[in-house]
Amino acid sequence: QVCCDPRLVKVDAAREVKTSAKAEAFHSFLSEELGRGRRVLVFSQFARMLALLSDELRARGVKHVTLTGASEERHKLVDSFQEGEVDVFLISLKAGGTGLTLTRADTVIHYDPWWNAAAQLQAPDRAHRIGQTQPVFVHKLDVAGSVEERMLELQQKKRALADMLFGKEVGTVRLLPDDVESLLAPLEDER
């Protein structure tokens, strides 16, 4: 969480921070995308992060809606975005990772990486649906030299091993004991 915004960490000094470099980069990038006429989905696994982003968007006068597990009337939020009332939809992984059709979106921003790479890959599918007539651009915001970078490395390593096992190539796959251990180990425990 500290990579997303220090205010998410349960340390008093961190909560006194007014913003983060990542949040500033996000708002700058989002402003550019909206200036290009983009309609944007923003995914985060942290509802508190979405609340911070929402507060700043409101302060900047950017109309948006937010969907988290606590949201009521989910369909009204979706309709608001799909009907063009707002151009930004903030969505938590758990509340919006599946079951939404948001074909008005042409841009997806992953504010933070997820341990579950499959869920992260499904998020852009909210925009890639039957009825989508435009290309969908997917952007990932990651803090260099941080735990986020390590998470991405672990995701890639597991994906490569899975591709080797279940990929399109025909033939016998030979795995070393370390490969099997790496494939089966939880991401958090991999070294």
Segments the model singles out, each with a brief description of its role:
Residues 1-89, 93-100, 170-171, 177-191:
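Conserved Helicase C-terminal RecA-like lobe
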Residues 69-72, 76-77, 81, 88-175:
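SF2 helicase/translocase ATPase core recognition
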